[in-house]
Amino acid sequence: MKTTAPRTQIRPVTLPDGVSLRRVAQVLLEAWEVGAHQWTGTPLQLREGASAKPSLPLPQDALDLFRLLADRRVDYLLVGGLAMLTYVNGRNTRDVDLLMSAATLRTIPELVIVEESEYFARAAYRSVQVDVLLTKNPLFKQVAQKFATRHRFAELSVPAVTVEGLIVLKLYALPSLYRQFALDRAALYETDITLLIAQHTPKLEPLIALVDQQMKPGDQKELQTILAECKARATLLRQRAGQASSITKPSA
């Protein structure tokens, strides 16, 4: 197996308050450069053939997307991987995830819709892939109404989901991921939830209660178990971080 060498230096993946939107563009580019499409001769490719290579996300396109949304005063929230990076150090993400209504999406002709279902749409803004969560889903609508904040970039502030909203969205997605045997994504989502709990200690009871309203009884029980496990791992992480800090702290 071979892979193309990345052209840019991979940096710590985070989007702290006040960082330039150009960092968003770099995150998307770095994710593209280490993506699975760079590998050749894998068993899957040999068996099924290579899939189409995604387009290279151009940095200027990512900047222009957020400027367009701001100039049009679009009612939306930044969610998904980029929103995660405003709260924790994490992994690269190759697309922009937005939450908005279907009616709002229709007012942005520059977002070319590639696929659409009842609650989701996949679109493209020039070279940038944009995944859209639609507020026709009752839970997504509640997230938009109850869990909105703003993240300040150097150039402008962007409407973004809160820590609590991210946890709600990830909990909601987990049963479907497990039914699809998308175990890699399910594991990543559980890790995301654990990190958000460990670093921000949100109140979890109202969040699971909100998600439960949209779940079948069997899924409700499983999510309670998953959330308890994430909470326990978060507690253990904080304990170990505290122990490491006390060990390395210089004596007076």
Predicted ranges, named:
Residues 2-252:
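Compositionally biased terminal segments of proteins
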